[in-house]
Amino acid sequence: MRVIFAGTPEFARVALERLLAAGFTVPLVLTQPDRPAGRGMKLQASPVKQCALEHGIAVAQPRSLRLDGKYPEEAAAARAAIEAAQADVMVVAAYGLILPQWVLDTPPRGCLNIHASLLPRWRGAAPIHRAIEAGDAETGVTIMQMDAGLDTGDMCLVERLPITADDTTASLHDKLADLGGRLIVEALEMSACGGLPRTPQPAEGVNYAHKIEKAESQIDWRQDAEAIARRLRAFNPFPGGATQYGDESIKVWEAHADPAIAVGTAAPGTVLSAGADGVRVACGNGVLCMTLLQRAGGKRLAAGDFLRGFDLPEGAVLDGAASGGTP
């Protein structure tokens, strides 16, 4: 079976590697254009492009696939490449571009998407983050037959995965990437034998995983400690949690709710204690114990090491609404 692959980040690279290892022919890869990255802001190829080049696969990087859009020449060139590839199916994983109808219609077996949620829950751009943030007990991967809607196509394969109490977006991403790679191989093998099932998504339980914005990193100490801890796990590795003490900006990377400590009459954001085992802060309900922190321009440090270079006394008040420098 000939497979065009469309994807960009590490999540997609894992799937591409699994397809190649399973023996599928991939004549063409579509991925986002190279972007400036790193301290030097040099152009950097996506993980999928790097993988494709390592395997000698042709790469197309159009800025748009809309023939009537802003970049019609790039879209037309991509169309020619897609048609010339004579693929049976296209596999899409975190590509980052909307696929026009002509793309969906070109491969005889259509386009299969690897989506990191249990559809129809968490359609959209950030399903892993939002599942953790919401406190979901489980998530999973859905292999979907794409249509013109936003993650609205028929479900072909679904597999569930528990979300553990210490999962971050980083750790859950890796588990789901591995699961997605395995499931898409299964789906294509079933399709080759003519037996890939399709089930319409239920109308109930639809919600959307909106893109993560950097401004969401600001900690609101009026919230429940458990909710803040979930957000910090959801926003690790990006954008982290942010708070302010005086003129200093602090990033928070790891924390947990501490039910053993009473808030008393302390206002939300008040430091209750600060030691090697963590910085405990009063929240709207409960106490948050911060264990991995970072000051502007510094490294991520365990609480004890952080406090050796940063005075954060008991009774200090952190401001989750303030904005300061970005570490």
From Swiss-Prot:
SUPFAM superfamilies attached to this UniProt entry: FMT C-terminal domain-like (SSF50486), Formyltransferase (SSF53328)
E.C. designation(s): 2.1.2.9
Entry-linked Gene3D superfamilies: 3.40.50.12230
Cysteine disulfide partners in this protein: none
Family: Belongs to the Fmt family.
Matching CDD domains: FMT_core_Met-tRNA-FMT_N (cd08646), Met_tRNA_FMT_C (cd08704)
Binding residues for (6S)-5,6,7,8-tetrahydrofolate: 117-120
Task of the protein: Attaches a formyl group to the free amino group of methionyl-tRNA(fMet). The formyl group appears to play a dual role in the initiator identity of N-formylmethionyl-tRNA by promoting its recognition by IF2 and preventing the misappropriation of this tRNA by the elongation apparatus.
UniProt keywords, alphabetically: Protein biosynthesis, Transferase
Top-level taxon of origin: Bacteria
GO molecular function: methionyl-tRNA formyltransferase activity
Annotated protein name in UniProt: Methionyl-tRNA formyltransferase
Top-level EC class: transferase
Organism of provenance: Delftia acidovorans (strain DSM 14801 / SPH-1)
Gene that this polypeptide is encoded by: fmt
Gene Ontology CC, one term: cytosol
